[in-house]
Amino acid sequence: MEDLRKDYSFQKNKEYEETFTSTNTNLILDLMGADKYIDLSQTFLDIDAGIDGVAKIEKENIGIALRIRKPDYFKYRYNFTLGHHFDKENSQVHAILNSLRPDVMSPNFILQINGVDENGYCEECVAIKIQTDVFARYLKELIQNNTLDNLFVPRLASYEFQMKDVFHETNSGVDYYYIENNTITKTASNDDN
């Protein structure tokens, strides 16, 4: 599939994510229920395994794939994104599917926050946290049914999943958050179903 994004800069996008991480460590800690967050941006774990950071929860270290979206994508604010088509080596689909393999490192959770401004602030954001191995089983099913490509949006060069579909298609491992002024105001978990 062709990448139809206009004026996309990987470096600018990375700087945008890093601005969020540096100004919102406490929000990441709250979303993950963690004591400490270690940023791994641009390290080999980020580049090769898709692990942007590690959340420390007591003695456990949890790998996180972090996704941050700007308010300009308001139309997609209730979507969850995996970048790049599956046939590309750098597709985020591969990092997620790796969670089903015991012989490679992969993120334990995907944390996507939609609506973050250029300064890393969440005036009105929505977030979804997904346990990677749970989502990988759903992804694998979509691949086997030849339906994954139905979710690919060439203009964004990404797969776009509606958060509500991910929430209902998996039986656990998905948490949903509303954030106002960098503070979590509402939560929902499909573990509660």
Label the predicted regions.
Residues 1-47:
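Acidic-basic catalytic patches of nuclease active cores, encompassing PD-(D/E)XK
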Residues 6-11, 67-123:
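Catalytic cores of nucleic-acid endonucleases
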Residues 34-35, 51, 107:
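Short, well-ordered alpha-helix to beta-strand connector turns
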Residues 42-58:
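Charged, well-structured alpha/beta interaction segments
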Residues 53-74:
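Conserved catalytic cores of phosphodiester-cleaving nucleases, focusing on short active-site segments
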Residues 54, 111-113, 128:
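Conserved hydrophobic/aromatic positions in well-ordered beta-strands
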Residues 58, 105-106, 131:
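Short, solvent-exposed coil/turn segments at beta-strand boundaries
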Residues 115-193:
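Non-catalytic C-terminal interaction segments of nucleic acid-processing enzymes
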